């Protein structure tokens, strides 16, 4: 009907144009009208044929390129997945297709979680490398259990190579199978070891061999090669509290195993002189403070051959070691008065001695005949005291007497500070006088700590009190010298010292025969029979 209405109108328009314009214009108008009619016919037909059914395109128009529900798709329904999981019609369906979909979703979720965890560990390891450097960051990551994952082919290749001669080849032979299994497990551990033991053993300097002239330890334990136990003795050397933090690292564990065959002085009282260089003090075996030595001896140390461990020191034993010149009964009474507190008891004894010094009454040390006989072999035997003690006698003044019986590595703490000779020089010397000490400083001073003979240095005199500091002309450092923080060097000639490590085995008679050289006048003052003359 549409076409019929459009076709008759065209001739009417053409006749009207023909009557108005004439014959040539009429022919052109008829051709244009026919072309317009022919062009309008295919467009109207194509629009009707290309229309899609509305049901199929409804989800695509509403949710373009969005994920669809797989369960609904299995049952012939297309539904967008966003906000649909809870309200899905087939969420509890147990058909074969839905069960397969559920298993696939579970596997995908596990893979995503694994990738996320690996990415997090890699980020943490990378941060540690940036913070502490490459090698230290890897060591810290390994100590914390964070090891960067290796490529999958490398891990499986090493495991397969280690298992190549494993159960199949080693099972028929009775003991051969166990050895092969142990070898394969050791190869696996060596593959992932950050600190190979061969490098540690090759790069570790050998520890010094024990010298034949070394005496026995105070408790009589022999100095010999250590056992093959991987444990490191806690009380060895000059440990300053960092042993516990170092022992947890993998480097410490490997060094424990590598250091099992190194010689070391074992036993309860064998100090740390023959230990490895890592634990040796830089100033030699004599430079550690008395408190460190006591602490090192009090710490438990395994003996040779699985023997019984050393007993823990009681507070009374600690007091007798700190104050060897006092009677045990007196120290026990002081300890009971302080309620068993060792620190308070030490303070009480020190305060008592300071009060005695202020009153001008220096404490007299009772002579010990055993110490007089063994003073030549002692480590802290000074020349003046050796000669005076060899002559022997209870009438000697306190600074010239031999020290009481004590192990050679443990000296009285405050003997030098409490010497009566220090008081005389204190009263007769100004704080601003030049540093020219009198002859009393060259006598027997038990507070003078000799440095190790291999260093060839003067003895280290620790100023424990203001009196000792004033007597050495160091009054301007009084607030530091009272705390024992300022080491001062003595003015005795270098040839006048006893070489502790080289002349340890000389006897008292040999020490008396070989008189020390005397120095007349000058800086060192006159020496009479090896004893200083009072100025």
From Swiss-Prot:
SUPFAM superfamilies: Cysteine-rich DNA binding domain, (DM domain) (SSF82927), UBA-like (SSF46934). This is Doublesex- and mab-3-related transcription factor A2. Belongs to the DMRT family. The keyword rRNA processing does not apply. One of its GO terms (cellular component) is nucleus. Residues 200-315 are annotated as: Disordered. The gene is DMRTA2. It is found in: Nucleus. It holds the Pfam family DMRT5_DMB. Keywords: DNA-binding, Metal-binding, Nucleus, Zinc. One of its GO terms (molecular function) is metal ion binding. May be involved in sexual development. InterPro entries: DM_DNA-bd, DM_DNA-bd_sf, DMA, DMRT, DMRT5_1_DMB_dom, UBA-like_sf. Residues 69-116 bind DNA. It comes from Bos taurus (Bovine). Residues 313-348 form the DMA domain. One of its GO terms (biological process) is sex differentiation.
């Amino acid at each position: 009907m549409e076409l019929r209405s459009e076709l008759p109108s065209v001739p009417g328009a053409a006749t009207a144009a023909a009557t108005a314009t004439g014959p040539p214009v009429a022919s052109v108008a008829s051709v244009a009208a026919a072309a317009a009619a022919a062009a309008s016919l295919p467009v109207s037909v194509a629009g009707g044929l290309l229309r899609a059914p509305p049901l199929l395109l409804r989800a695509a128009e509403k949710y373009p390129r969005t994920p669809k529900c797989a369960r609904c798709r299995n049952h012939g329904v297309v539904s967008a997945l966003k906000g649909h999981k809870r309200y899905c019609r087939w969420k509890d369906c147990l058909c074969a297709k839905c069960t397969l979909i559920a298993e696939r979703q579970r596997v995908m979720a596990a893979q995503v979680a694994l990738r996320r965890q690996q990415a997090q560990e890699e980020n943490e390891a990378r941060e540690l490398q940036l913070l502490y450097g490459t090698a230290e960051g890897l060591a810290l990551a390994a100590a914390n259990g964070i090891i960067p994952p290796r490529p999958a082919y490398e891990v499986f290749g090493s495991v397969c190579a280690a298992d190549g001669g494993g159960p199949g080849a080693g099972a028929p032979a009775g003991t051969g199978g166990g050895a092969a299994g142990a070898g394969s497990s050791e190869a696996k551990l060596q593959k992932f070891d950050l600190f190979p033991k061969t490098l540690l053993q090759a790069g570790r300097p050998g520890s010094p061999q024990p010298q034949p002239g070394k005496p026995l330890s105070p408790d009589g334990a022999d100095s010999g090669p250590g056992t093959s136990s991987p444990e490191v003795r806690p009380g060895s050397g000059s440990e300053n509290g960092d042993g516990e933090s170092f022992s947890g690292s993998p480097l410490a564990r490997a060094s424990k195993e590598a250091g099992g065959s190194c010689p070391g002085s074992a036993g309860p009282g064998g100090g740390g002189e023959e230990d490895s260089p890592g634990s040796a003090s830089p100033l030699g075996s004599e430079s550690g403070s008395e408190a460190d030595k006591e602490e090192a001896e009090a710490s438990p140390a395994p003996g040779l051959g699985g023997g019984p461990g050393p007993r823990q020191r009681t507070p009374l034993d600690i007091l007798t070691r700190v104050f060897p010149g006092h009677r045990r009964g007196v120290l026990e009474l002081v300890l009971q008065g302080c309620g068993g507190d060792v620190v308070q008891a030490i303070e009480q004894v020190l305060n008592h001695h300071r009060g005695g010094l202020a009153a001008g009454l220096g404490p007299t040390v009772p002579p010990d005949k055993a110490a007089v006989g063994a003073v030549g072999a002692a480590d802290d035997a000074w020349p003046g005291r050796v000669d005076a003690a060899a002559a022997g006698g209870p009438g000697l003044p306190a600074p010239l007497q031999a020290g009481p019986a004590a192990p050679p590595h443990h000296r009285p703490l405050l003997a030098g500070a409490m010497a009566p000779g220090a008081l005389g020089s204190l009263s007769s010397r100004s704080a601003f006088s030049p540093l020219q000490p009198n002859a009393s400083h060259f006598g027997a001073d038990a507070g003078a700590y000799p440095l190790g003979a291999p260093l060839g240095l003067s003895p280290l005199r620790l100023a424990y009190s203001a009196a000792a500091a004033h007597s050495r002309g160091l009054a301007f450092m009084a607030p530091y010298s009272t705390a024992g923080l300022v080491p001062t060097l003595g003015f005795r000639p270098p040839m006048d010292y006893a070489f502790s490590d080289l002349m340890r085995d000389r006897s008292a008679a040999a020490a008396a025969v070989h008189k020390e050289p005397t120095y007349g006048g000058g800086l060192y003052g006159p020496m009479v029979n090896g004893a200083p003359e009072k100025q």
